[in-house]
């Protein structure tokens, strides 16, 4: 049988028996969702939080054409601390964002000693510090306070990963929304500040 483009196929389609799919934020990376959330917070006058640039030292550049430069060799100037920082209602905010496809744990190799030390320094200065953890296969996002990450890091130094059970016990689930997409300020206000704002 010939199926012309303007004709409907005479074959009947079998209904799909697969699970319903969640197409919310499809194709958008976790980092882009956080950036969109931060843009929303800024536009609404709620917070000023930005992604920190990674300092890079450019060593060699090729010029294949006069108008085009191509960086061929570059190095990180220093180890990066955390991904985001800013101010919310007079409080200093500093956080790291991690995404994993794993279903039951987040790899601890994603957290480096200098990042843990940086988080300890933020907490010592009464700053608000945490990690946003996104399990992409389950579409679950959690805010884990830095002191719970630090405690796990020091207690279980040999562990290869932090179990999802630990994150669910000590962290706070963040339900994705439209505006903002990852409403983490709600968790900060309710759980880390006890409902108080300055």
Swiss-Prot record:
Cofactor: how and how many bound: Binds 1 Mg(2+) ion per subunit.
Annotated localization: Cytoplasm
Gene Ontology MF term list: endonuclease activity; magnesium ion binding; nucleic acid binding
InterPro entries named among the record's database cross-references: Resolv_RecU, Restrct_endonuc-II-like, tRNA_endonuc-like_dom_sf
Swiss-Prot/TrEMBL cofactor(s): Mg(2+)
Site (Transition state stabilizer) residue list: 98
GO-annotated biological processes: chromosome segregation; DNA recombination; DNA repair
Residues bound to Mg(2+): 81, 83, 96, 115
Top-level class of the enzyme under EC nomenclature: hydrolase
Ranges for region Disordered: 1-21
Superkingdom to which the source organism belongs: Bacteria
EC number: 3.1.21.10
Reactions performed catalytically: Endonucleolytic cleavage at a junction such as a reciprocal single-stranded crossover between two homologous DNA duplexes (Holliday junction)
Entry annotated with the keyword DNA repair: yes
NCBIfam families membership: PRK02234.1-1 (NF002580), PRK02234.1-5 (NF002584), recU (TIGR00648)
Function: Endonuclease that resolves Holliday junction intermediates in genetic recombination. Cleaves mobile four-strand junctions by introducing symmetrical nicks in paired strands. Promotes annealing of linear ssDNA with homologous dsDNA. Required for DNA repair, homologous recombination and chromosome segregation.
Family: Belongs to the RecU family.
Protein name: Holliday junction resolvase RecU
UniProt organism field: Streptococcus pneumoniae (strain Taiwan19F-14)
Gene behind this protein: recU
């Amino acid at each position: 049988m010939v199926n012309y483009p303007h004709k409907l196929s005479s074959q009947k389609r079998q209904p799909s028996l697969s699970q319903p799919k969640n197409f919310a934020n499809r194709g958008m990376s976790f980092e882009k969702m956080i950036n969109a959330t931060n843009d929303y917070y800024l536009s609404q006058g709620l917070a000023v939080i930005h992604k920190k640039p990674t300092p890079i030292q450019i060593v060699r550049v090729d010029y294949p054409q006069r108008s085009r430069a191509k960086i061929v060799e570059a190095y990180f100037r220093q180890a990066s601390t955390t991904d985001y920082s800013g101010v919310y209602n007079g409080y200093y905010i500093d956080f790291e964002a991690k995404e994993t496809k794993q279903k039951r744990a987040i790899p601890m190799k994603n957290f480096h000693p200098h990042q843990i030390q940086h988080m300890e320094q933020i907490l010592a200065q009464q700053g608000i510090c945490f990690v946003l953890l996104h399990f992409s296969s389950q579409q679950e996002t959690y805010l884990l306070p830095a002191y719970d990450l630090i405690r796990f890091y020091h207690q279980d130094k040999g562990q290869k990963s932090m179990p999802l059970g630990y994150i669910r016990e000590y962290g706070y689930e963040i339900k994705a929304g439209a505006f903002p997409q990852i409403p983490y300020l709600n968790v900060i206000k309710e759980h880390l500040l006890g409902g108080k704002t300055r």
